[in-house]
């Protein structure tokens, strides 16, 4: 098996387990057993559990960003492309493996002084705000740059709330309500 295939299998296995069970609740031995590899193989690819956590966060984020970009672009130009982020979340919520936000789950489990993981999560969240800003600029022309920044942050906060509350309540009404609220604020 190629090195990249092995590394990808380790990342995919760790991603599944970290997201399902939590970062702290998932041990290295569990990842090794699930991936069907030797301990030395894991440590040839990742020097620590923290390095594997970074790969997990990056894997989840890359998959998410690609998916949401394709999905939003498939919608008609205008408000629909912006509101589509909530429809995308609704589809994600319907997945039997939905377990909330991988970033928030992870940051809640790490020590406050773990700047490596915290910085990666902040970067991902800021990149999502940038994606929302781009959606606004590409689809709505009546906002100034300053207004776009503020609006993107507001939509981001609505989205994050919808993720957390839909997970908590195990229902999609938070997604529907935040989409309705977003529709009102982008008019």
Residue positions per predicted region:
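Basic, helix-initiating cap at the start of DNA-binding domains
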Residues: 1-21, 25-37, 51
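Short hydrophobic/aromatic patch on the recognition helix
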Residues: 36-46
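A secondary-structure capping/hinge motif
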Residues: 50-52, 106
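Hydrophobic alpha-helical connector segments
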Residues: 55, 69-95, 151-155
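Short, basic, alpha-helical segments at the C-terminal edge of helix-turn-helix-like DNA-binding modules
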Residues: 58-65
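Amphipathic alpha-helical packing segments from all-alpha helical-bundle domains
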Residues: 80, 114-139
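Amphipathic alpha-helical segments used for helix-helix packing
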Residues: 95-115
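Hydrophobic/aromatic-rich alpha-helical bundle segments in the mid-to-C-terminal region
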Residues: 117-124, 139-184
């Amino acid at each position: 098996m190629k090195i990249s295939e092995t590394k990808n299998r380790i990342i995919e296995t760790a991603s599944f387990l970290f997201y399902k069970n939590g970062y702290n609740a998932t041990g290295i031995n569990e990842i090794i057993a699930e991936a069907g590899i030797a301990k030395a193989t894991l440590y040839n690819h990742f020097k620590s559990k923290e390095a594997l956590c970074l790969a997990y966060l990056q894997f989840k984020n890359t998959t998410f960003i690609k998916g949401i970009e394709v999905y939003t672009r498939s919608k008609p130009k205008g408000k629909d492309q912006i509101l589509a982020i909530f429809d995308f979340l609704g589809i994600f919520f319907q997945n039997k493996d939905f377990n909330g936000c991988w970033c928030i789950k992870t940051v809640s489990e790490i020590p406050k002084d773990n700047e490596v993981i915290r910085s990666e999560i902040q970067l991902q969240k800021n990149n999502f705000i940038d994606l929302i800003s781009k959606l606004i600029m590409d689809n709505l022309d009546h906002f100034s740059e300053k207004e776009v920044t503020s609006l993107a942050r507001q939509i981001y906060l609505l989205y994050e709330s919808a993720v957390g509350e839909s997970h908590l309540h195990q229902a999609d009404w938070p997604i529907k309500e935040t989409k309705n609220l977003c529709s009102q604020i982008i008019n």
